[in-house]
UniProtKB/Swiss-Prot annotation:
The gene is PFK2. It is an enzyme of class 2 (transferase). Beta-D-fructose 6-phosphate 1 binds at R369, R461. Beta-D-fructose 2,6-bisphosphate 1 binds at K833. Beta-D-fructose 6-phosphate 2 binds at S332, I333, D334, M376, G377, R378, E433, H467, V468, Q469, R470. Catalyzes the phosphorylation of D-fructose 6-phosphate to fructose 1,6-bisphosphate by ATP, the first committing step of glycolysis. The active site is at D334 (proton acceptor). This is ATP-dependent 6-phosphofructokinase subunit beta. Its EC number is 2.7.1.11. Gene3D superfamilies: 2,3-Dihydroxybiphenyl 1,2-Dioxygenase, domain 1, 3.40.50.450, Phosphofructokinase domain. Heterooctamer of 4 alpha and 4 beta chains.
């Protein structure tokens, strides 16, 4: 039933021609369901069924608009679709309808352009240009002024490509959200491409739509901004970015643009953004691209004033676009931006380098050859440094730490020669493309090769990786980073005010944060300036702390027992390392780093093989020799063996006996929750067993990431990369067969970490985790969501769907049971299958992140033991042991990342106050916000837990 919102019963209209009159009659009868009541002279009367509403249309060629005038007016109004609220353009008539969603679908079928508020999924009002040139609106509201409009959720039909978006039940829409700031936001990729840019574009587009704003993409970087028009500044719909997550490069294009460096080019860009109605611009690129973006914002007031003075924009446009809001995301494989730990694409490029060197290792070892590997990095040696750490390279050349023209040859030959003398068959030297001597002379790969051949007589080859480093899909970390930063960038644009400087979205350890864009770019550029000025100490000081820490670690590990130890003999210790729990990527890296760092310091490293069971039953203790662990950094699993038994489950007294026999001064445990429990048992037994009165550190290593005291565990990244590749392949199969969804069962115990992040990086339609369980109501909503999604994407490519289920989310609803339920309840709209990756999730070769973090954590653990030995030494054999002394308690700790810091936390505090022992979980988890974002970006509604 249709009526007028303000309560009046009659609507009077004027048609300027017979054609427009007939169009109006067809509109009100065929679309709105009115019927022709009568015709008198030039008047036509239409009414609804109970005659409570009358529409009178008069044919008047003088006062009404002709067909051409109607078309011109329609074109003029539609041009302002993304710029102006149509309600402000003219007096509008608003009709009340019972089913607004159905009317929207009907109007769309008849090719009417609609302006919908607040958005297409939850429409309150919809406006279109009627057949005789009037703006007409429709609503489900009973009153013209209402504080709580009735929200009807859209259910898309086949062929109706809608801007699907949804919000989790925990963040359901309310009246406050409808008052939020809405801005038209454009995203642009610029400069060199990097893996993860597509994930960033997808996140920006969908987060923008989710917040009720309009999303745009600037094609071809700044070149597209200068050229402008709908071809280069294109409105993006929800479905336009499907499949972006698994694709490398940038699908919206990038180009270097000299025109934008000139003011006239930026003036054209300003005009084009205003024409498109853009309020905010998110730029993903390197320091040059971000510098241009900030300059653009700085000049914006003068640019828009110039356009107004020239008459190229109206006063209304000038007032509407007085301010441009800009936010930066760093897309660069060099990872050379200051004030952020990682850039989008950096770890993907590092993965390509490490994978290539892993392959090269095999042939180098076979022929006892040396390989010189050239990697990218003109002014930043991050790729070369991290690759050197992750692959145990013999030598690296980076621009931040040059040597004199002769010194580098002597240093390299000295280290490589000693490695060869120790029995190493292969040699890997990594050269950053920007490597230089202290007098700024470039060091080329050919020069390095010649030195290795002439001075050491090594059969040497050169491998230049080139653009292979940019290619391929993004790794799990870069997909996560790009997605979270894209969502944060949209929030930043919506929250910015004219007096707030442009932000740069950064990451600090494990936390997404905002930094001043101008300051970050300034520091980044000053590094290159310092190098050019030969001020290498300043250049190194401008790098972040983690870079300097990694460089110091590499130099220490690289010398190992080949140089004089750095500690005096009286301070050298015996330090043991043991693996507990299931194998995880990075365990071997931790053993390698611990052993080599101990050797460089003068300590004696020991490996306890096969866990505490191996120690108590077989006395499986062995000192570590350098040549025995050569290459372990790149090997998956656990070379020293591992099992799940804790000290109390084996024989804690026998373990104490062997600790005393070997006179261990420190212990490093690498493992998951069993390792956590083991450390607690050892710490609790100190009063009874003096041999446990030594510093002890746990390095969390488990794919479940369920160890209290840390937000990241070794092995989790390797697991996510393996699972990501698996999901991409399964999704490809689902897309190829059309109308297919796969339920993928993943590990993780009682932790939903793996399922949550796998859902985020694969674009899964839903994920089920133990923390929430699976309710029938949620299943029903997810099935309906899948039906809607398949309806919208009917006939489209890249339309395969995934559902991620953690094994312990439900013991009753197994993957096969879930698949049967989905197939039965979907009424044939799609087909559901299962896929179970099993132990494939543990991964093969550890990822570069797990390798480098394993090294970093192990060295920090050794340093912790060095720092705390003196605390326990006075009490080693005292009968009255102060077990509750805080200093004593702090000598048994978990090393972890929490928020944005690397920290040691007492095992006693964690065990007593932050652990759910029965569930083998920490009491608080940090990835709930990740779940919300993952659901938002696929349009899933998640119910609150009761």
């Amino acid at each position: 039933m249709i009526s007028i919102v303000n309560g009046t019963s009659t609507l009077s209209l004027v048609a300027g021609s017979v054609e427009t009159l007939n169009q109006a009659i067809n509109f009100y009868t065929n679309i709105l369901g009115l019927s022709v009541h009568s015709e008198q002279n030039d008047w036509t009367y239409l009414s609804n069924d109970d005659n409570k509403m009358i529409v009178k249309i008069q044919l008047d060629t003088k006062s009404g608009l002709s067909l051409d005038q109607v078309n011109d007016r329609r074109t003029e109004i539609i041009a302002k679709l993304n710029v102006t609220d149509w309600r402000s353009l003219d007096t509008t008539s608003v009709l009340k309808v019972q089913n607004l969603v159905a009317l929207i679908e009907t109007l769309t079928t008849f090719n009417y352009t609609l302006q919908i508020t607040p958005n297409e999924l939850y429409p309150n009002e919809v406006y279109c240009v009627g057949p005789i040139g009037y703006i007409i609106g429709f609503t489900a509201c009973d009153e013209p002024l209402t504080l709580v409009p009735p929200l009807q959720k859209s259910h898309p039909k086949p062929g109706l490509v809608s801007n699907l978006m949804s919000k989790s039940g925990s963040q359901s829409r309310n009246i406050e959200e409808t008052k939020a700031v809405r801005r038209n936001i454009a995203v642009m990729t610029s400069g060199g491409d990097s893996q993860g840019m597509n994930a960033a574009v997808r996140a920006v587009v969908r987060a923008t739509i989710f917040h009720g704003s309009k999303a745009f993409a600037v094609q071809e970087g700044y070149a597209g901004l200068v050229k402008g028009g709908p071809e280069y500044i294109k409105e993006m719909k929800w479905q336009d970015v499907r499949g972006f997550l698994s694709e490398g490069g940038t699908n919206i294009g990038t180009a270097r643009c000299m025109e934008f460096k000139e003011r006239w080019g930026r003036l054209k860009g300003c005009k084009n953004l205003i024409d498109a109605g853009i309020d905010g611009l998110i730029v993903c690129g390197g320091d040059g691209s971000l510098t241009g973006a900030d300059l653009f914002r700085h000049e914006w007031p003068s640019l828009i004033q110039e356009l107004k003075d020239k008459g190229e924009i109206t006063n209304e446009q000038f007032e509407r676009h007085k301010h441009l809001y800009i936010c930066g995301m760093v897309g660069s494989i060099d990872n050379d931006m200051a004030m952020t730990d990682a850039t989008i694409g950096g770890y993907s490029a590092l993965e390509r380098i490490c994978r290539a060197i892993d392959y090269i290792d095999a042939t180098a070892n076979s022929h006892s050859r040396a390989f010189v590997v050239e990697v990218m990095g003109r002014h930043c040696g991050w790729l070369a440094l991290m690759a050197g750490i992750a692959t145990s390279a013999d030598y690296i050349f980076i621009p931040e730490k040059p040597a004199s023209s002769k010194d580098w040859q002597d240093q390299m030959c000295d280290i490589v020669g000693k490695h060869r003398a120790q029995g190493k068959r292969k040699t890997i030297v990594i050269v950053a493309e920007g490597a230089i001597t202290s007098d700024l002379k470039p060091i080329t790969s050919d020069e390095v090769k010649d030195v290795l051949v002439d001075r050491l007589g090594l059969d040497t080859r050169i491998t230049v990786l080139g653009h292979v480093q940019r290619g391929g899909t993004a790794v799990a970390f870069d997909r996560t980073l790009a997605t979270l930063q894209g969502v944060e960038a949209v929030k930043a644009i919506l929250e910015l005010t004219p007096d707030v400087p442009s932000p740069l979205i950064a990451i600090d350890e494990n936390k997404i944060c905002r930094r001043p864009l101008v300051e970050a770019v300034r520091i980044t550029k000053s590094v290159a300036s310092a190098i050019e000025a030969k001020d290498f100490e300043k250049a190194m000081s401008l790098r972040d702390h983690e870079f300097k820490e990694h460089l110091a670690n590499f130099m220490a590990m690289n010398t190992a027992n080949h140089e004089k130890p750095t500690l005096p003999r009286e301070k050298r210790k015996k330090i043991a390392i043991i693996n507990i729990g299931a194998p995880a990527g990075g365990m071997n890296s931790a053993v390698y780093a611990m052993a080599t760092y101990c050797m460089s310091r003068g300590h004696t490293p020991y490996a306890i093989h096969n866990g505490f069971a191996g120690l108590s039953r077989h006395e499986s203790v062995k000192s570590i020799e350098w040549i025995d662990i050569e290459g372990w950094n790149s090997i998956g699993g656990s070379e020293i063996g591992t099992n799940r038994q804790t000290p109390e489950e084996t024989d804690i007294g026998m373990i104490a006996h062997y600790f005393e026999k070997y006179q261990f001064d420190g212990l490093i445990i690498v493992g998951g929750f069993e390792a956590f429990v083991s450390l607690e048992q050892l710490e609790r037994s100190r009063a009874m067993y003096p041999s446990f009165r030594i510093p002890m550190v746990l390095i969390p290593a488990t794919i479940s990431n369920n160890v209290p005291g840390t937000e990241y565990s070794l092995g989790a990244d390797t697991c996510l990369n393996s699972l990501m590749e698996y999901c991409d392949i399964v999704k490809q199969s689902a897309s190829a067969t059309r109308g297919t969804a796969f339920i993928i069962d993943v590990q993780g115990g009682n932790s939903g970490y793996i399922a949550t992040f796998a859902s985020l990086i694969s674009g899964a339609q839903a994920s089920y985790v133990p923390e929430e369980g699976i309710s029938l109501q949620q299943l029903e909503m997810d099935i309906n969501s899948l039906r809607e999604a398949f309806a919208v994407e009917q006939g489209m490519t890249k339309s395969g769907k995934l559902i991620i289920k953690s094994s312990n989310a439900s013991k009753v609803l197994t993957p096969h049971t879930l698949a049967d339920i989905f197939n039965d309840e979907c009424h044939g709209d799609f087909d559901t299958k299962t896929a179970i990756p099993g132990h494939v999730q543990q991964g093969g070769l550890p990822s570069p992140i797990d390798r480098s973090r394993g090294d970093r954590f192990a060295i920090r653990a050794v340093q912790f033991i060095e720092d705390h030995c003196d605390v326990l030494a006075p009490y080693r054999y005292e009968l009255d042991f102060p077990i509750d002394d805080k200093k004593i308690l702090n000598t048994a700790a978990v090393l972890g990342i929490k928020s944005s810091r690397l920290r040691f936390t007492s095992i006693r505090h964690l065990f007593d106050f932050e652990t759910e022992l029965g569930r083998r979980m920490p009491k608080t988890i940090y990835w709930n916000t990740i779940r919300d974002i993952s659901d938002q970006l696929v349009g899933r509604t998640r119910l609150d837990k009761p």
